[in-house]
């Protein structure tokens, strides 16, 4: 599971077909 740092965005939803999560801390 990879996390990318996004500005003012904190979502634990992953797009279909990819295990990518968007978190503000990028930890998880």
UniProtKB/Swiss-Prot annotation:
Entry keyword annotation includes Disulfide bond: yes
Please name the InterPro entries in this protein's record: Snake_toxin-like_sf (IPR045860)
- Show the GO cellular component annotation of the record: extracellular region
Q: Where does it primarily localize?
A: secreted
Give the highest taxon in the source lineage: Eukaryota
Q: In which tissues is it expressed?
A: Expressed by the venom gland.
Which GO molecular function annotations are given, in alphabetical order?
calcium channel regulator activity; potassium channel regulator activity; toxin activity
Q: Which UniProt keywords apply?
A: Calcium channel impairing toxin, Calcium-activated potassium channel impairing toxin, Disulfide bond, Ion channel impairing toxin, Neurotoxin, Potassium channel impairing toxin, Secreted, Toxin, Voltage-gated calcium channel impairing toxin
User: In this UniProt entry, which cysteines form S-S bonds?
Assistant: 3-21
Q: Where in the cell is it found?
A: Secreted
Q: Does Transcription regulation count among this protein's keywords?
A: no
Question: Further notes on this entry?
Answer: Is composed of 65-68 amino acid residues.
Q: Which purpose does this protein serve, as stated in its record? A: The heterotrimer blocks the voltage-dependent L-type calcium channels (Cav1/CACNA1) from the heart, and the small conductance calcium-activated potassium channels (KCa2/KCNN) in the chromaffin cells and in the brain. Is very toxic to mice.
The record's family statement is: Belongs to the three-finger toxin family. Long-chain subfamily. Type II alpha-neurotoxin sub-subfamily.
* Subunit annotation: Heterotrimer composed of this alpha-neurotoxin-like peptide of 8 kDa, a neurotoxic phospholipase of 16 kDa (AC Q7LZG2) and a serine protease inhibitor of 7 kDa (AC B7S4N9) at an approximate stoichiometry of 1:1:4; non-covalently linked.
Protein known as? Taicatoxin, alpha-neurotoxin-like component
* Protein's organism: Oxyuranus scutellatus scutellatus (Australian taipan)
């Amino acid at each position: 599971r990879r996390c990318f740092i996004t500005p003012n965005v904190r979502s634990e939803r992953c797009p279909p077909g990819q295990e990518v999560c968007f978190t503000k801390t990028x930890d998880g």
